[in-house]
Structure formats: structure tokens, C-alpha cells
Amino acid sequence: ATTEIYTLSLHDALPILGVTGAEKPAPARIFMHGQPTFKFAVKAVPYCIDQVLEKAVMAIEDVDFFVFHQANARIIDLAAKKYHIPPEKYYKNIQKYGNTSAASIPLVISELHDLGKVGPGSRVLVVGFGGGLTWGGALVEFA
């Protein structure tokens, strides 16, 4: 059962840049500005953790496991370091599969269940972020 959920999108608050018109053809490739995206995620993940914990009236110590979107191992490690989360309380599989996009959190939860690390009564805080500069989090308690 989900006990708390938090989502936010900055899409509407950001100016639209580089809009192409009839006289300027659209680029043929999609690309990402890696450094600004990394900086965004490094700020968004801790902010989301804080918001979920505040709304759930819980502390870091009350969470059994943390599951982060598997976009970048450094982002995961920085969030864990900021909150002093020990390695046994969070999991990375990006080194095995790469960035699996929207499937990353469910894949991690499935692996954790198979490994016996989460199960009935486990409280898991999940945080995801992605396209459109959006992020969200939830505190899930397994029944």
C-alpha cells in the first residue's frame, strides 16, 4: 500500500527554448545536456526524499530500503551519501542493465524481492526523475 506520494513538474514553469519554425528545420537527433541534467537530479532527489518523509511524518531511519531511478550511479551514490544511507539499504542495478527508463524502479523492487531484501512490512522509499524535468517519490509499505 502506498502511504505517501509526491510529484512535481517544472515543465510549465520553464521557458520553451529552441522552438523550430517553418524556416528552420528541426534537428534530426534527440540529445540531452548531461551536466545540467545531472545537476538537476542531484538537487531533485534529496528534495523529493525530504518531501516524502515530511508528508509521511517519518525520518530516514524509519525507512527499510531506498530505491532510486537507475539513470546514473553517481546520482544514486550522492543521494545516499547526503543522507548517510548505508550501502545495504539501497541497491543499484544500472551496471547490469544501463538506464532502463521508467522500468528502473520496478526492476529494482523485483530484484530486491527475489533477494529477500524486501517483503511484508518493509517500508521502501522510491524516487524517480525524468523527462520534462519531473520527479516523484512514494513511501511504499509492503503487505
What label would you give each PLM region?
Residues A1-T7:
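Short, exposed "boundary/linker" segments that immediately precede the start
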Residues L8-I94:
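Hydrophobic pocket-lining "lid/loop/helix" segments that shape and contact the acyl-thioester
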Residues V42, L53, D64-A143:
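Claisen-condensing/thiolase-fold acyl-transfer catalytic domains that form or cleave C-C bonds
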